[in-house]
Swiss-Prot record:
Stretches for region Disordered: 353-374
Taxonomic source organism: Homo sapiens
Compositionally biased intervals (Polar residues): 356-374
Function text: May be a survival factor for hippocampal and mesencephalic neurons. The shedded form up-regulates cancer cell proliferation, probably by promoting ERK1/2 phosphorylation.
Domain EGF-like: 261-301
Protein name: Tomoregulin-2
Transmembrane regions: 321-341
Length: 374
């Protein structure tokens, strides 16, 4: 007599135990690799604003200095904004007109402490409050001319001290003919063209500070971008000396970026772009719209369904590659498990049915033999 046995379960652990480690492998790779979230370049200030301040490091591929925005280029409470294709540092302090004069560490007097901080932001150099009230006249008025009134003896005495070194200059008492030395390194400062009060264009605020230190005169940032009627600036050469650089040599390199320069539209254009930013081009009188991702049209009113993917930068391409490999492995494992189940289950059921039929056949033969004997 053959007892009936329940069919074996095809989805048992023994069937797929050889593939479990393949399922765990992608999970382990995800835990170890932890790819960062892909994101496009920030389109507004809120995209990079964190509780601790401005931080665009997650968007920075270090390929083009035009799109860098970090604490080294916009310090002293400056606000880093993107205007068109350029990132600029804006110092918009809402200072009141209260007259509470303070003396700054650069030897200049300011109407109040707010104006001192605003000057530090524009010059991108640290200016501390030395004392309350205006700076003493004998210590220099802060005009930067380096000339001290008085007799020739008094003037000679003053020039033999380090009091004349201003605007970030350091005094070198061991030098024979040069008292003030400017140890300012602008090699790591990002490109952010500015127009200074001396009518010259500079690549960044650090170069303005450097020129102010070298000339020992007050040079401030007047406007963003290059000066309209100027072609020269001062730069430091490898031997530490200063030389004038003709901007005409680099005009071709900067022409493309200047050509695409845009400025935000006035407030009365609010609502001109439905899903984007309103901008004015320097070559166009009518405003234009810079649409957000997924939108198109003159006023960004149409949805663009062709935007189905984001092209990552080369720095993040390795994370995309890891994710693609993990996805491929998971699909392959699922296919193998499905094939395993579909091939082994019918075979197991077929063997069970054969055994069951064999048992019934033997039982019928025994019954027939007994009947014949009777």
């Amino acid at each position: 007599m053959v007892l009936w046995e329940s069919p074996r379960q095809c989805s048992s652990w023994t069937l797929c135990e050889g593939f479990c480690w393949l399922l765990l492998l992608p999970v382990m790779l995800l835990i170890v690799a932890r790819p960062v979230k892909l994101a496009a370049f920030p389109t507004s200030l809120s995209d990079c604003q964190t509780p601790t301040g401005w931080n665009c490091s997650g968007y920075d591929d270090r390929e083009n200095d035009l799109f860098l925005c970090d604490t080294n280029t916009c310090k002293f409470d400056g606000e880093c904004l993107r205007i068109g294709d350029t990132v600029t540092c804006v110092c918009q302090f809402k200072c009141n007109n209260d007259y509470v004069p303070v003396c700054g560490s650069n030897g200049e007097s300011y109407q109040n402490e707010c104006y001192l901080r605003q000057a530090a932001c524009k010059q991108q150099s640290e200016i501390l409050v030395v004392s309350e009230g205006s700076c003493a006249t004998d210590a220099g008025s802060g005009s930067g001319d380096g000339v001290h009134e008085g007799s020739g003896e008094t003037s000679q005495k003053e020039t033999s001290t380090c009091d004349i070194c201003q605007f970030g200059a350091e005094c070198d008492e061991d030098a024979e003919d040069v008292w003030c030395v400017c140890n300012i390194d602008c090699s790591q400062t990002n490109f952010n063209p500015l127009c200074a009060s001396d009518g010259k264009s500079y690549d960044n605020a650090c170069q303005i500070k450097e020129a102010s230190c070298q000339k020992q005169e007050k040079i401030e940032v007047m406007s963003l971008g290059r000066c309209q009627d100027n072609t020269t600036t001062t730069t430091k050469s490898e031997d530490g000396h200063y030389a004038r650089t003709d901007y005409a040599e680099n005009a071709n390199k900067l022409e493309e970026s200047a050509r695409e320069h845009h400025i935000p539209c006035p407030e009365h254009y609010n609502g001109f772009c439905m899903h984007g930013k309103c901008e004015h081009s320097i070559n166009m009188q009518e405003p234009s719209c810079r649409c957000d991702a997924g939108y198109t049209g003159q006023h960004c009113e149409k949805k663009d369904y062709s935007v189905l993917y984001v092209v990552p930068g080369p720095v993040r391409f390795q994370y995309v590659l890891i994710a693609a490999v993990i996805g491929t492995i998971q699909i392959a494992v699922i296919c193998v498990v499905v094939l395993c189940i579909t091939r082994k289950c019918p075979r197991s059921n077929r063997i069970h049915r054969q055994k069951q039929n064999t048992g019934h056949y033997s039982s019928d033969n025994t019954t027939r033999a007994s009947t014949r004997l009777i």
